[in-house]
Amino acid sequence: MLYFIGLGLFSEDDISYKGFKALKSVDCIYAEFYTAKLMGGNIDNLIEKLDVPFITLKREDVEDANVIIKEAMTKDIAFVTAGDSLMATTHTELYVEAINKGIKTQIIHGSSIFSAAPGISGLQAYKFGKTTTVPFPDENFFPHSPYDAIKLNSQMGLHTLVLLDIQAHKDRYMTVNQALDYLSKVESERKEHVFDDDRIVIGIAQAGSKHPIVKGGRVSDVKNFDFGKPLHCIIVPANLHFIEAEALITLADVDKELLKDFL
């Protein structure tokens, strides 16, 4: 048996009761924290409560998947991730391979940024388009794909959830400020008015915590806001329903004057 279990957004306390019971029942737990990480707690606290062998995998271990598949053929195994299960391509590949090998599977979902970000900002979840990710740039690596996703979504009147790069093995997490600088640099190269300084954006930090940070405004203003500890993400709104506009004023501290065209 192979369980796919989402641990939730922020800390080890976010796991569902159903997920916790499943983890107590298995022979071994494999965890992956390179696509997302629980920033608000200590996973060791959960491990102590479970008293089950707990192995944290490297990226290449998940991409290979042979160890997990082989174990699940004869034992009850859990594959756990922060957030919701099966949100990454490599996780889906593992799920499909397990089914093709005749291994029994069960998915136990967890809270995710995909639902939390629209909720805490007051935006309607069904009005979001393609999600994109801003990566850490390198000497020969500066993709424009996040800019293109925002452009395409905006043309269709859809909001964009922008995830920010995570390099957990280096303890390196992109901030809202870094991502806005990245997108502004693309704008300076492309000059297509997709991400001008007066574009409204929403920065979010520590979603799932007791006191998440949600701050909106012009790009030029939000760039200078201190969002504190990671994890961070950004929403780039498109056309707003008046209820969404009212919510952004209250929930994201957006200046009412910036939203007057939607009220």
Swiss-Prot record:
Keyword set includes S-adenosyl-L-methionine: yes
Record pathway: Protein modification; peptidyl-diphthamide biosynthesis
SUPFAM superfamilies on file: Tetrapyrrole methylase (SSF53790)
Family: Belongs to the diphthine synthase family.
Species, as recorded: Methanosphaera stadtmanae (strain ATCC 43021 / DSM 3091 / JCM 11832 / MCB-3)
Domain of life: Archaea
Binding sites annotated in the UniProt record for S-adenosyl-L-methionine: 9, 84, 87, 112-113, 164, 207, 232
Reported function: S-adenosyl-L-methionine-dependent methyltransferase that catalyzes the trimethylation of the amino group of the modified target histidine residue in translation elongation factor 2 (EF-2), to form an intermediate called diphthine. The three successive methylation reactions represent the second step of diphthamide biosynthesis.
Classification via Pfam families: TP_methylase
E.C. code: 2.1.1.98
Swiss-Prot/TrEMBL keywords: Methyltransferase, S-adenosyl-L-methionine, Transferase
Protein name: Diphthine synthase
Catalytic activity: 2-[(3S)-amino-3-carboxypropyl]-L-histidyl-[translation elongation factor 2] + 3 S-adenosyl-L-methionine = diphthine-[translation elongation factor 2] + 3 S-adenosyl-L-homocysteine + 3 H(+)
InterPro entries cross-referenced by the UniProt entry: 4pyrrol_Mease, 4pyrrol_Methylase_sf, 4pyrrole_Mease_sub1, 4pyrrole_Mease_sub2, Dphthn_synthase
GO BP annotations, alphabetical order: methylation; protein histidyl modification to diphthamide
Self-association state and partner proteins as the record states: Homodimer.
A GO molecular function held by the record: diphthine synthase activity
